[in-house]
Design a protein with these regions (language model features):
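A helix-coil-helix interface module used to build multimeric assemblies
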Residues: 2-166
Length: 166
């Protein structure tokens, strides 16, 4: 079987590429891609990846040089995401593949080693938990501000007559 005849050959690089003989239709690809939603997870994906890289280094699964390269690359990626200059691609489907690809562009093989001992499901679960925690913290702060505003308003109107509310 020639390379082009193998299932998934025309979709190389996709997580699902071994299952299909033909590339996905562009409409299906856009429908399946989660990049537009995932962009809000980028900083959490970076934080999770940095924690994972540090664990790999402590376990001696990657070298100190690899860890330094990953940290340097992730710092650059974080800056690109925050500035809006990160090169997002629908071809890479999600936040994880986009960041992993960019990291490998920046630091070479050290970026590929970051995937050691971690599944994409682990990444998704971690990113979502970190994002949700940040959202809860933000909502808690907003609720606290509303509560303080209501308390302040109530203290200013302790003598206000409210006959309709008996």
């Amino acid at each position: 079987m020639q390379q082009d005849d193998k299932p998934g050959a025309k979709s190389a690089g996709k997580a699902w590429s071994g299952r299909f003989a033909e590339p996905l239709d562009s409409l299906t690809q856009r429908f399946n891609a989660s990049v537009s939603f995932d962009q809000r997870l980028a900083q959490f994906d970076i934080a999770g990846s940095l924690a994972h890289a540090r664990m790999l280094a402590r376990a001696k699964l990657i070298s100190a040089a690899d860890l330094a390269a990953i940290e340097r690359g992730m710092a650059q990626i974080s800056g690109e995401v925050l500035s809006g200059s990160f090169p997002w691609s629908l071809e890479r489907e999600d936040v994880h593949l986009n960041i992993e690809h960019r990291l490998t562009e920046l630091v070479g093989d050290a970026g590929k080693r970051l995937h050691t001992a971690r599944s994409r499901n682990d990444q998704v679960a971690t990113d979502m938990r970190l994002w949700l925690r940040a959202q809860i913290d933000e909502l808690t702060g907003l609720l606290r501000a509303v509560r303080e505003g209501l308390i302040d308003l109530a203290s200013k109107h302790t003598d206000t007559d409210r006959r309709a509310h008996v």
